[in-house]
Structure formats: structure tokens, C-alpha cells
């Protein structure tokens, strides 16, 4: 597993976010087709992600996938019609709280806000590939997507955002509260705006392209 790349400066990150290699990679990522919500969830969060959850009475992948499929199916119309940042942020926040509550009920352990948001944002990242979405809906959702915060997207900001007190081994569990989560998303969004790209491009640069 490659180590997270720590971006040397904001200007370096801006240049990388907007270069042709990144833009081509993003285009290829979102050209994938997911016919069903099941496909979105299964391809969005793979088995390796669940290794962080150990010694549970129920397989963590089962708990998450059942919850995610049900949640997305029940809120499909709402999610498909979201068209502004505030509504999208509320949707992600409420879904994360729902996941954390379900997780505690079934596993008798704490998911944690940061880990819950990361898993759900991975699903939402892939949700833009759902074939039933119109081109306009797809692009709107890509523009609104939040960055899944894990070791790659968190540690990548260590030198750019020293006020976040990121260590070299920070993981998705580093984010504890909604306010902390919002601070990360705001910093990433501001940098992405300077590059003229959606915030989710940072995740694709830090994670997907870092694992080529």
C-alpha cells in the first residue's frame, strides 16, 4: 500500500488538480456505469475499507451495505434533486448520523462521525455513476460531492493546513465532530475552487491516482 502523498504547497495542489492527467482520470472514473443502487454501494466501498472495523459480532460490510442500500433507495428522489451546497451538506450529515445510530444498534460499538461520513461519501462518489441519472443531475452531484476523509486525503493536507494539526499517521478516525468535518471540507473546497474543479477531484487525485 503506497504512503499518502503530502502536497508541498497549495499552489502545487492547485496545479495538480487542474492538469490534464487528473482531468482525464476523473473523466474515466465517472464514465463507469452503475445500473442499480446495489452496484453503487458494492463498488463504492470495497472490502479493504472494512478492515478498520475488527472484532464485531456481525460482518461490518454486511451492516454497512444493508443500511446504505436501504438509505439510498428511500432517499433516491431527494438525493437526485439536490442542487445546492447547503441541502447536500444537510443530506450527508443526517445520513451519517443515521449510519452511526444503526451501527451502534447492530454492532454494539461506535462508528464515529468521521468514519461514518467517509464511508457514506464513498457511496455518494460512486452514486454519480448511476445510469438512471440525467447528465445534468450527474454533473450537479459531482459538483456538490464531499471528499471522503481518510489517511490519503487528510495527510495530504498536512503542510498546506497546519492549523488542522494533522499527523503523518492520521486516518479517517481523526475526524471526530461535524465541525471538524466541515472545516476539512471547506479548506478542500476553497482550494478546488482556485483550480476551477469540484472538490471531489481532490479525492480522486489523492486516493485513486495514488493507487494506480
Question: Which functions belong to the PLM regions below?
Answer:
Residues 6, 14-19, 38-43, 47-69:
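Nuclease catalytic cores
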Residues 50-104:
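A glycine-rich, hydrophobic loop/mini-helix early in the fold
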Residues 1-43, 96, 100, 108-212:
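C-terminal accessory module of base-excision DNA glycosylases/AP lyases that mediates lesion recognition
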